[in-house]
Amino acid sequence: MAEGWLNAKLAGKGWLAESAGVAAWGGSPASPEAVEAMREIGVDISGHSSRGLSRERMAAADYILVMTHGHRSEMVRRFPDAKDKIFLVHGFSPDGERDVMDPMGFAVEVYRRTRDEMIAALGDFLVHLAERGELSSE
C-alpha cells in the first residue's frame, strides 16, 4: 500500500518507491483487502508482487522506511551498513516514532485504518523531502 501511494504522489519527481518485506519470499500478490483499500482512494496495486530484501536493494535505496521498531532492529542487524538510512515510517511525523500495525489477516476496515495512518505518515515524509530540496519538479 505504501509503495503504491508513494509512487502515485512521486510520479514525475525523480523518485521511485519499492517495497520489500523483512520476511517476504517474493512473488505473492497484494491481499484483496489491500487492493480494495487502495482502489477506494484511486491507487491501483492489483499488479503488485512482493519482493524480499537484498543487499543490492538496500544499497540502492536513499531512504528505507519500515513500519515497526522490530522491523528496524531486524534490518539494522541484517544490513548494518544501511543503518543510517533506515527510518520508521512515523519517523518524520510530529507525533513521534511509533509502529504501524500490520493489517495482514484482518478485515478491509483494518486495512483502511492502516492505509490512512500510513498516508498521514508518508505525507510527513514527503514534507521532509521537500524541505530538504530532494524532490524535483519534473
Q: What residue spans do the PLM features occupy?
A:
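Conserved active-site segments centered on acidic
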Residues: 1-60, 127-138
